[in-house]
Amino acid sequence: TTEIYTLSLHDALPIFVASGKGGVGKSTVAANLAVTIARSGYKTALVDADIYGPSIPRMYGIEDANPEIIKFGEKESIFPVEKYGVKVISIGFFVDRKQSLIWRGPMAANAIKQLYENTFWEDIDYMIIDFPPGTGDIQLTTIQDLNLKGAVIVTTPQEISLNDARKAASMFTTKDLEVPILGIIENMSWFTPVNHPEEKYYLFGKGGGHKMAKEFNTWLLGQVPLVMEVGEAAEKGLTIFNQKNTCIIDAFEKIAGTLLSNIEKVS
């Protein structure tokens, strides 16, 4: 007989990657963070819970994937798609990508919960959840439904982005939720030309990530440079490990190492 598992809420360490607004590179960070952790030797899963803008399938080059669904009696389990050593599930596998989803909060939150619970994960160490941007009903319901290990907040250095990121961090740390903030990732910290890796141009200001980490008494996990090749690679389904500019690989390896260390500290 074949036994189909669903993930017990205590079998893996679920980590939300969140932002207060769109456009800060949250999904790109989540996608590359998951690959970096997997390359460190851990069994890693990535849940694309960005329900209104699922972009992980495109970033991993698996847009046309069709996850297998196995039914045993009354129970159905979805087999995740594996790419770059990461087991991936996304709402994008099950909806027409040419149509926009118009779901109310409870329906959207329930869809995220089903992705999380009804998938055959099998021996996962870390689960990265690419969380919808914002601080509304979907976010609150999902946080309450899932047994989270912690959240990582993605922001860019400028104040307008930091203001929204603060709202996201405050949501996680309310008395009703009390989800630990495992750290801040400052994305697009500076621009570095591929032919001049030692040069830094601070296009969006400087020091925002440090400032926010201090405000919330948490860690600045790292600063990710703005590298044009990252966006171009994502459009082709490639990760940071498929390009020449190694400064961004160094940044993500540092972030992953610090994040995993911080998880041990809050355990």
Features from the language model and the residues they span:
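Phosphate-binding loop that captures ATP/GTP phosphates
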Residues: 43-98
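Residue-level signature of catalytic and energy-coupling elements of molecular machines
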Residues: 22, 56, 89, 112, ...
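C-terminal boundary of histidine-terminating zinc-finger modules
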Residues: 236-246
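Walker A/P-loop phosphate-binding motif and the immediately C-terminal alpha-helix
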Residues: 14-50
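Short, small-residue-biased leader/transition segments that mark boundaries at the very start
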Residues: 1-13
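Switch II (G3) loop of P-loop NTPases
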Residues: 91-106, 115-141
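Conserved catalytic-core segment of NTP-binding enzymes
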Residues: 125-126, 132-232
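Short glycine/serine/threonine-rich phosphate/pyrophosphate-binding segments
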Residues: 24-32, 54-55, 131-139, 162-164
